[in-house]
C-alpha cells in the first residue's frame, strides 16, 4: 500500500520499515472492501485498520469521515493517544471522541450520542466479539444498521472470533472478506502458561510467592468480578504491598490516571477486572496472574495476551484449585499446555518442568540486517574483535527492548 506523505513521515519517525503479517494482509483489501481481521493480541491490528483509513482522509473536508468503535474507555484512550502522535506528522488532521464535532476521525463507545453523518465512509469495530455478547448485541446491530444507510465500508477486528460470531457479522454486512492470521484461536506462540500447585497452602501465599519471584517485573493480576477484586485488594493493602487497581467502578478520571501511570511504567503491580483484558497495550508488563478464572472462557486468552506483545515473551499463571478444574480441562482440550509449578513450604517456587535458560527473543528482519552489518564490519581480524562485536550486538537488543515497537499496534 502506498501511504500519503504525512503517514510516510510518521512511519519514518517511528522507525517502521516493515509491517506485520496481519497488516500486510489487511492492507490488500481494506478500506476498499468490508473486512474481518483476526490475529493474535499484540500483532498490529490497530495499525492494520487505522493507517488505511487515515490514508483516505481529506483534511480539507471538515466533516467526520471515519469512526472507530471500541468496547472500553481504556481502549478509546489508547487509540486517541496513538492518533495524537500521528497528528504531529499529519497537518490538519482532527480526531475526537464526540460525534458533534467536525473531527475527521472519531473514536467512540457505542451509545446514545451517535450522530449519523453521510460523509462517514469507514466504520471499524475493534474487539468486535465483545459487541456480539448477549448484553450488547442488539445495540451493535442497531449501530451497524444505522451506518448502513450511507453504505460505508466496515472493518471488524478481534483476536478471538469464532464461527458463530462470524456468522452473526455476515448476517448484517455482506459481502465480507475474512483475513484470518490466527489459525489456532486458543494459543499464543509467545505466552508460557503455568499451573501453580499450592500444596495445601492458601492462594494468597501463592500470589505472594509469584510477586516475590517476579520482583523485578511488572505484574497484572486479573479478577473476574468486583467482589473478588475487592477481597484481593483488601488482602494486598492489609499486607502493606504496593499496588494499583483498575476497574469499572472508578470514575473516568480515576481510570484514566491509573491506566496512564501503568502505561508509563510507574506501576509494578496492577490489579484489574476483565475490562482491561481487551486490546490494551501495557508494554512494560511481562507477567499475568489470574486470581480467579474469567466467566467467559475466551477472556483467558485476552488476559494472557496482555503480556505477549511486540514480539516479547510473557508468563501467565493460574492456581491449581478444585473449582478451576472444569475450565482448566476445557483449556487443555483447546490446546493450552500448562507447565507445572510448585509452591514450597518456605514460600519459594519450584519449576520442575521449566528450563531456567532465557527464551531467545524474536528477531525482526530489521534487526537481522543490523546484526549482519555489524558482523560485516569485522572482516579483518583484530585483537578482541569478537568481544567488541558481541557487545555491539547486545547493545542492539537492549535498544530494541527500550524502544516501543510501534508496528505492533
UniProtKB/Swiss-Prot annotation:
Write down the top EC class of this protein. Answer: hydrolase
Name the positions where ATP binds: 39-46
Q: What's in the keyword line of the UniProt record?
A: ATP-binding, Helicase, Hydrolase, Nucleotide-binding, RNA-binding
Positions of the Helicase ATP-binding domain:
26-179
The family classification in the record reads: Belongs to the DEAD box helicase family.
Gene3D superfamilies named among the record's database cross-references: P-loop containing nucleotide triphosphate hydrolases (3.40.50.300)
Q: Which organism is it from?
A: Mycoplasma pneumoniae (strain ATCC 29342 / M129 / Subtype 1)
Q: What lineage is on file?
A: Bacteria, Bacillati, Mycoplasmatota, Mycoplasmoidales, Mycoplasmoidaceae
- Extract the GO molecular function terms from the UniProt entry: ATP binding; ATP hydrolysis activity; RNA binding; RNA helicase activity
**Catalysis performed (reactions):** ATP + H2O = ADP + phosphate + H(+)
According to the UniProt entry, the coiled-coil residues are none
The cross-references to CDD domains, in alphabetical order and at most eight, read: SF2_C_DEAD
Q: Which residues form the Helicase C-terminal domain?
A: 190-349
What PROSITE patterns has UniProt attached to this entry?
HELICASE_ATP_BIND_1, HELICASE_CTER
Q: Identify the EC number(s).
A: 3.6.4.13
- Protein name according to UniProt: Probable ATP-dependent RNA helicase MG308 homolog
Which SMART domains does the entry link to? DEXDc (SM00487), HELICc (SM00490)
DEVD box: where is this motif? Answer: 126-129
